[in-house]
């Protein structure tokens, strides 16, 4: 009977060319087959079954690629909660809250309510930490890196917390409206439940849930040999290049290990937030004297040079796109509201000061705090995301971007002497008018050539720009006269095309828009083909009409979204760039897009 059953099962699998879940019975010594259907499977099983069936000749490699979804590949890249443990937690009433699932994976740790506490507990005490904040800012990055996961009460899919979490592969849940954070009492509250700092919580960034207590996790195997083989097949069929966003050499190494063919975005401003560098940045911002500003920039240069050299060494033989400073300067300074509060506290303490020494010390602190506050107020803008940032900052403070370009080319010359094949590409952000790019490129390319002359070394390089504004997309033919490449920053391009705030929309009207079918998808998660996609199409066609070899890529968060990758393939982009942790997903999605396009062409 067993032999007969084995033969029938084999025949069914061969006929349906799919793993089967069969029901049978044995009555009076006779085998009866009751029904058969395609079997359910885990992500690991789906990959292995597809590869084995292709190797057995039951299906083609193209079919094997098509049978595995990008979401199943994503499972291999992040810890997940044990299913039974999660169900038990639900049954016990331990599901605390839900928010936006902005960075996949499961994380368990104690609550830390600020970045310094998160870093101290994680590095000095060896604790697993979940950093919980109303929202994160650039000066929270050190705590975010130390934490196992990130939880915020505000923010959307393209908020600072979401972007950084995806960049560094940290599970994150944001926009948890029910979460009330009391920094004074060092506790959080959801409805009537209070969680104190130091209590254990578990967050699921894959589906956006928060649990009290510790849930068991499962760590998948990234180097699964079946997955490695399937992705190698995917690489044979995809046309789109897949690059990685990386600000540090370890991120670049991870991206390359996952199959990235270049760095599509290095955010230089992230390098400024290291503890030993931020005071130099503050000095540069605080002074109005050119000599003092240059001294601060000269002190920053070696840090930037070392960072770039590390990236170049890891990416030996592959392109590295380095974006010059993008955010407005006030983002590097203390928060305006915090400064006002601190100043008020100091003045209250001054009223109650008992000794002359204490009075003098407080007066000095008040004077310095007031100086910083005035500078921050001078830098403040009503709409900083459309204010003095990107190329505008480089034009107003040319010595800042000149320092960055010098650091890039000094690093490139150094590593080339070591035998490294270095390929820097300098990206100027937020261009809206061709003359901005023309002016900046002239200044910066002159500095690059000056460094190469000083070092007596020639470097193959490119200068390009980000297309983040509708005007830039519509005038890409003019921009292409001065750009060797363009890269779509689709976060800002979506924001400026729709005229909505990416930081506010996902916790506001956008949810209702999607629930009521006003918008089919979240445009910050998947490219809006009719609007943003149309602008991209215009830019690619206009740009390549002037320069047929124009390299066109995408480095926004959409670069790791399978639906957006399909649109990028359709538009003829050169590459997509995404978080290192999304590279395997993007490789498979790019193959899906290529195979789907081929089927449409042949009508099969």
Region locations from a protein language model:
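A short, contiguous, amphipathic alpha-helix enriched in charged residues
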Residues: 1-7
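Acidic, glycine-rich flexible loop/linker segments
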Residues: 15, 32, 80-85, 92-94, ...
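Conserved metal-phosphate-binding beta-hairpin within the catalytic cores
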Residues: 17-39
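Short coil/turn segments at secondary-structure boundaries
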Residues: 21-25, 61-67, 79-84, 312, ...
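Catalytic, metal-anchored helix/loop core of enzyme active sites in primary metabolism
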Residues: 45-53
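Amphipathic alpha-helical
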Residues: 61-108, 433-462
């Amino acid at each position: 009977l067993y032999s007969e059953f084995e033969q029938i099962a084999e025949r069914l699998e061969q006929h349906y060319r799919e793993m089967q879940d069969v029901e049978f019975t044995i009555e009076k010594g006779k085998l009866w087959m009751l029904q058969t259907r395609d079997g359910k499977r885990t992500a690991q099983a789906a990959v292995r079954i597809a590869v084995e069936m292709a190797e057995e000749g039951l299906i083609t490699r193209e079919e094997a690629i098509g049978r595995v979804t990008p979401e199943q590949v994503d499972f291999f890249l992040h810890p997940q909660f044990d299913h039974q443990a999660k169900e038990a937690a639900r049954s016990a009433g331990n599901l605390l809250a839900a928010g936006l699932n902005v960075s996949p994976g499961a994380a368990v740790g104690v609550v830390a309510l600020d970045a310094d506490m998160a870093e101290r507990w994680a590095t000095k005490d060896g604790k697993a930490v979940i950093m919980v904040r109303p929202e994160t800012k650039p000066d929270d990055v050190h705590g975010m890196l130390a934490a196992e996961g990130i939880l915020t009460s505000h923010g959307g899919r393209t908020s600072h917390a979401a972007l950084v979490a995806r960049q560094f592969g940290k599970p994150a849940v944001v926009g948890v409206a029910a979460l009330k954070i009391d920094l004074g009492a060092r506790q959080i509250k959801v409805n009537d439940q209070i969680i104190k700092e130091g209590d254990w919580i578990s967050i699921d960034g894959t589906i956006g849930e928060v649990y009290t207590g510790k849930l068991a996790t499962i760590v998948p195997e990234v180097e699964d040999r079946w997955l490695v083989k399937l992705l190698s097949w995917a690489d044979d069929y995809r046309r789109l290049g897949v690059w990685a966003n990386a600000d540090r050499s370890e991120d670049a190494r991870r991206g390359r290990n996952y199959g990235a063919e270049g760095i599509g975005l290095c955010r230089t401003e992230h390098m400024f937030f290291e503890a030993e560098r931020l005071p130099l940045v503050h000095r540069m911002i605080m002074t109005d004297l050119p000599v003092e500003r240059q001294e601060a920039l000269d002190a920053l240069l070696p840090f930037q040079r070392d960072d770039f050299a590390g990236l170049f060494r890891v990416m030996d033989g592959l392109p590295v796109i380095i974006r010059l400073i993008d955010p407005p300067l006030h983002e590097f300074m203390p928060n305006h509201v915090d400064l006002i509060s601190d100043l008020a506290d100091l003045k209250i303490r001054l009223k109650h000061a008992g000794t002359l020494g204490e009075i003098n010390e407080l007066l000095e602190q008040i004077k310095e705090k007031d100086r910083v506050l005035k500078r921050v107020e001078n830098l403040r803008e009503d709409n900083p995301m459309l204010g003095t940032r990107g190329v505008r900052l480089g034009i107003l403070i040319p010595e800042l971007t000149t320092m960055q370009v010098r650091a890039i080319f000094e690093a490139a010359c150094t590593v080339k002497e070591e035998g490294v094949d270095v390929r820097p590409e300098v990206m100027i952000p937020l261009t809206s008018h061709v003359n901005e790019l023309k002016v900046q490129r002239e200044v910066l390319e002159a500095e690059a050539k000056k460094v190469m002359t000083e070092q007596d070394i020639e470097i193959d390089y490119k200068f390009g720009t980000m297309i983040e504004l509708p005007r830039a997309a519509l005038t890409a033919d003019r921009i292409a006269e001065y750009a060797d490449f363009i890269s779509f920053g689709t976060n800002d391009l979506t924001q400026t095309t729709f005229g909505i705030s990416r930081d506010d929309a996902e916790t506001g009207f956008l949810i209702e828009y999607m629930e009521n079918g006003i918008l089919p998808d979240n445009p910050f998660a998947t490219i809006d083909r009719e609007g943003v996609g149309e602008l991209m199409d215009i830019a690619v066609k206009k740009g390549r009409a002037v320069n047929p070899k124009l390299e066109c890529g995408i480095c926004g968060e959409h670069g790791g979204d399978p639906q957006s990758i399909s649109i990028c393939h359709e538009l003829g982009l050169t590459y997509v760039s995404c978080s290192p942790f999304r590279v395997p997903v993007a490789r498979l999605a790019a193959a899906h897009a290529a195979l789907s396009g081929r089927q449409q062409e042949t009508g099969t």
